[in-house]
Amino acid sequence: MTKEVTVESFELDHIAVKAPYVRLISEEFGPKGDLITNFDIRLVQPNEDSIPTAGLHTIEHLLAKLIRQRIDGMIDCSPFGCRTGFHLIMWGKHTTTQIATVIKASLEEIANTISWKDVPGTTIESCGNYKDHSLFSAKEWAKLILKQGISDDPFERHLV
């Protein structure tokens, strides 16, 4: 017998949200009591735009490093299939304001100071699709997202 489940992200009204934003999706406790938080890092407005794969791939690799440099507890940051943002999975309790501040600082570094030598995991040995990267695209999208501002609320624009 198949268990009935509800996938939270499919219940979200993608028309009502106002990207870019950070949204707490869930807080769950593991079998030993450890808290895991799941955040929606929405960089572009759903159904209006999407980040091209090569740029998103490069942003993904950079966020894997830059987030860890700015906050403890990162488990994973994985892109949404719709290419509008990322799931950020963290150990412990974090606020959307904390996470939005970290994302903003990371995007500022991507936009302003990152060079190709700073992008981790771009060789055939270290990446499953190493030819599909674009630092130019990553930088342009980071600038556009920063120009719009990052909110710590998905429905009201409350910029960090």
Swiss-Prot record:
Function recorded in the entry? Involved in the synthesis of autoinducer 2 (AI-2) which is secreted by bacteria and is used to communicate both the cell density and the metabolic potential of the environment. The regulation of gene expression in response to changes in cell density is called quorum sensing. Catalyzes the transformation of S-ribosylhomocysteine (RHC) to homocysteine (HC) and 4,5-dihydroxy-2,3-pentadione (DPD).
Quote the SUPFAM superfamilies the UniProt record gives: LuxS/MPP-like metallohydrolase
Recorded family membership: Belongs to the LuxS family.
Q: Does the keyword Ribosomal protein apply?
A: no
Q: Does the keyword Phosphoprotein apply?
A: no
Q: Name one Pfam family in it.
A: LuxS
- Entry keywords, A to Z: Autoinducer synthesis, Iron, Lyase, Metal-binding, Quorum sensing
* Gene Ontology BP annotations: quorum sensing
Q: Which cofactor does it need?
A: Fe cation
Q: Native species of this protein?
A: Streptococcus mutans serotype c (strain ATCC 700610 / UA159)
Which residues make up the binding site for Fe cation?
H57, H61, C127
Which GO molecular function entries does the Swiss-Prot or TrEMBL record give?
iron ion binding; S-ribosylhomocysteine lyase activity
Q: Note the NCBIfam families from the entry.
A: PRK02260.2-5 (NF002607), PRK02260.3-1 (NF002608)
Q: What is this protein called?
A: S-ribosylhomocysteine lyase
Query: Reaction catalysed by this chain?
Result: S-(5-deoxy-D-ribos-5-yl)-L-homocysteine = (S)-4,5-dihydroxypentane-2,3-dione + L-homocysteine
EC id: 4.4.1.21
Cofactor binding comment, as recorded: Binds 1 Fe cation per subunit.
Task: Look up the signal peptide feature and give its range.
Answer: none
Q: How does it assemble?
A: Homodimer.
